[in-house]
Amino acid sequence: MLHTIKPVTNARKSTKRLGRGPGSGTGKTSGKGHKGQLARSGKTLRPGFEGGQIPFFQRIPKRGFHNFSQKRYALLNLKTLESFPQDTVVTPQLLLEKKIIKDQLCGIKVLSQGTLTKKLLVKASKFSKQAQAAILAVGGNIEVI
């Protein structure tokens, strides 16, 4: 029984043998054509290289500004907080454990999307005014860390 097992047709593709005579189809120049930069050894070119002319990404105009000192916050909405049981202390560590946020970045900011009906203690870096009001309105507490 075991001696009859074979791989599915075309499951194991044989490697292309280069430079093995004219009958092989890839003899002589081994599929590299004649001369030129790409026919030489070590032919790798960086992505976006256009043969020496000014590349497209340098030709188009640049716009805007990238603030390198910008702080990025992991965002958390009230509708996500609603999934926690009553009287839970919601901390960044708890959010990471439950995989609600992937990374703390510079901290966590709580936003007001959705509704909150449970009393919670929420520890975060920032709160929007509406989120803060919603948490306090249901008897919860906030703590800026």
Swiss-Prot record:
Gene Ontology biological process: translation
Chain segments carrying region Disordered: 1-50
Gene Ontology molecular function, alphabetical: rRNA binding; structural constituent of ribosome
SUPFAM superfamilies linked to this entry: Ribosomal proteins L15p and L18e
GO cellular component terms listed in the entry, alphabetical order: cytosolic large ribosomal subunit
Residue ranges, compositional bias (Gly residues): 20-30
InterPro entries, per the entry: Ribosomal_uL15 (IPR030878), Ribosomal_uL15/eL18 (IPR021131), Ribosomal_uL15/eL18_sf (IPR036227), Ribosomal_uL15_bac-type (IPR005749), Ribosomal_uL15_CS (IPR001196)
Listed Pfam families: Ribosomal_L27A (PF00828)
Coiled coil: none
UniProt keyword terms in alphabetical order: Ribonucleoprotein, Ribosomal protein, RNA-binding, rRNA-binding
Functional summary from the UniProt entry: Binds to the 23S rRNA.
Subunit structure, as described in the record: Part of the 50S ribosomal subunit.
Name of the molecule in the record: Large ribosomal subunit protein uL15
Record gene name: rplO
